[in-house]
């Protein structure tokens, strides 16, 4: 029973973690450039085309679009879906390992790991020279 509970909880938390990872991508992309997190809505940085709902699904959209913008065919860095997927796993894994037995501890562990990883990523990005590419 606990195994099924753990797996179902992890299956719920995996896409939630990927969505949080996608949001953290936006934060790390926009904040250093002084852009708002709310406006304009998600868009291609090259052609400025607003992304549709089906282009906003973490990891799956990247695969469906073959890693390119639908508007201008600009390549989307491979690091984006990797970080989104790892964010999903980071939130889901503590629950899969025993979340139903210790739900609060599993959620706190997953959230702390996720935040820690993204804080480290933000520090790494802040130390990267402004002109270098980010994938």
Spans of model-derived segments:
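A membrane-topology feature that recognizes alpha-helical transmembrane segments
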Residues: 1-135
